[in-house]
Amino acid sequence: MTQFIEGKWVEGLGHEVTSINPANQKVIWNSKTATPEQVGVAVDAARNAQFDWFMLGFDARLAIVEAYRDQLEANKAEMAEVIAQETGKPQWETATEAGAMIGKIGLSVAAYHKRTGTSENDTPAGRAVLRHKPHGVVAVFGPYNFPGHLPNGHIVPALLAGNTVVFKPSELTPKVAELMLKLWEKAGLPKGVINLVQGEVETGKALAAHPQIDGLFFTGSSRTGHILHQQYAGDPGKILALEMGGNNPLIIKDVADTKAAVHDIIQSAYISAGQRCTCARRLYVEKGAAGDALLEQLVAAVKQIQVGPWNAQPQPFMGSMISETAAKGMVEAQRNLVNLGGNALVELTHLEVGTGLVSPGLIDVTGVIELPDEEYFGPLLQVVRYSDFDEAIKLANATRYGLSAGILADSREDYDYFLARIRAGIVNWNKQITGASGAAPFGGVGASGNHRASAFYAADYCAYPVASVEADAVSLPATLSPGLSI
């Protein structure tokens, strides 16, 4: 019983699917997919529940959301372990994800009041009142890299605003989604307010195409996001929020503490086995002795990165990629870059057949003319040597994406120069570019999104503004308009 529809756990009626631990290939979850017909039932359940959920009022909705927060707190160790087993990420990292899920509640409440909520002002024309109302039924598509935290960042603000939700998680991380819904159930969520449909492409297509959803919130690949954007292009009445990937640049310029710089480069490129949408994919290092020395330190440090299963002791820095298929894809990406003229400074290798375990890779692609503008979603960092700061910024901007970017530089003037010219929604200075605050918006431009930043700004796409001019009774104005006699 792995579909949660109208407040009940039911069996999927589609084909059988399994979820495996990518570090050892053990099956940790199996069930059947939701059929398009079951997706329709889930949407109907959300539609039937939506008005009553909205009319409960914010305080009553908040009480249930806070009860969910308490369930997360009580079960955070289990949540972290399930995420670790299903994604292959090491336990230290999934503990931070479980913690972020808890922290998202307070941030979402603050965002609701600051970004939406209700306000009023007296004007000569009457009382001007600004309110926000929910869109209705929204679909949430979750990714596999942060299977708890990222969909949580859509679901919580959507519910606070008064929407109901149909949640379709990644088919690679169904067990995390199942645990999330069990905690919502324990929190006392009314039936139909969240509905979980587990499945693969057929399930997702049925949900995205359903005429009764009022919005879709997606986190995932640029390819899928662009398909959804095309699908919704002729339907302006539906809100679409896309958070996609990036081919993210990191520039190094005149840094005295090279050891700290190497640390921030590694945290930017290799955390989560390179499976964060904000991970650095391109590293720009100045030509000359200083750049040579930094690269030498980086090569040595990358070779020392510990890789291992989610539960290895002592804990590794990098766990498994999400699947053996993903691991093989990174080996192939490296091979393609070498064939184009790249030089592997540290070779990315598939460490164990049948698993997603790979070693981190570092490849010098300086001078490669036809460098693909691709998001290689794994631990492979491309190095480009530059002679001129303007050249480095120009190369950094030479991408259709625009999610994250950063510079490590001791000079504030260099940062200001970079900040004014770089094209990205997240721009960091002397910090890893995978570091983002839930108290700030999260999103990018270009192929990285559709101008619907998430995190603190998720409240913006979960409700629409309603402007009213009000008076307690009808009354004649002191002076009638010319030409009127009443």
Swiss-Prot record:
Pathway assigned to this chain's UniProt record = Amino-acid degradation; L-arginine degradation via AST pathway; L-glutamate and succinate from L-arginine: step 4/5
First-tier enzyme category under EC: oxidoreductase
Pfam family membership, one: Aldedh
All disulfide bonds of the chain are: none
Record-listed NAD(+) binding positions: 220-225
Which keywords appear in this protein's UniProt record, sorted alphabetically? Answer: Arginine metabolism, NAD, Oxidoreductase
One biological process term from GO is:
arginine catabolic process to glutamate
CDD domains registered for this protein in UniProt: ALDH_SGSD_AstD
Which PROSITE patterns does the record match to this protein? ALDEHYDE_DEHYDR_CYS, ALDEHYDE_DEHYDR_GLU
Q: What protein does this entry describe?
A: N-succinylglutamate 5-semialdehyde dehydrogenase
